[in-house]
């Protein structure tokens, strides 16, 4: 895929800011079982350990950032929007010390280069303008042996398209990057960024109101093992490890 021009990237970023700085109640941080399972699934898949320095790309209001910090990761947030980062600070209040950075991941602050054990994100990669360029930039933020890991929607799950049609806070313009979230696209992009041990897996089954119900997590764990369901499970994890120079 050809890299976007700086002007095209800037316009893309402006569209994303307009999209995300709208009032989105679903993005407010909570401690629901649904969100906690996302955090635990990504942390396990990426091999994160408490105390490791972790950068969350596209952290927004801290929906996942706060849960990561509460689990003992030295997490920092990076986002295009100072508005969303200010909301993150208000949710964290005095409970957590969370360094945040207003930047495009393609042009990160120089102080962040080679600084992180992991660069991660939740439902952020499909909003990024240029996958190849952005993943190469993320790899520069890692220590040797560091990992990139993302949780993304599965474009083969038809319920996402129903959501986009029915929920006013979701739009095709804002979320159409989901179509690129296929292993055949993401894994080669990770490898081109200098990463090895590239892998993916799918998980999940229920929407939040069922996943948060009593026994929802146990039922999901059973349904995930049913082979015909596996290609359409709603969530995907992707990872890669920075190869030694």
Predicted features along the sequence, with ranges:
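Class I SAM-dependent methyltransferase SAM/SAH-binding core
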Residues: 61-107
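A short acidic, Gly/Pro-enriched loop at the edge of an enzyme's catalytic core
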Residues: 107-119
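A C-terminal cap/extension of S-adenosyl-L-methionine-dependent methyltransferases
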Residues: 110, 163-168, 198-245
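Acceptor-substrate binding/catalytic loop of class I
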Residues: 169-185
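A short glycine-rich, Lys/Arg-flanked "PGG" loop and its adjoining helix->strand segment in the class I
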Residues: 132-144
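Conserved class I S-adenosyl-L-methionine
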Residues: 1-48, 51-60, 149-171
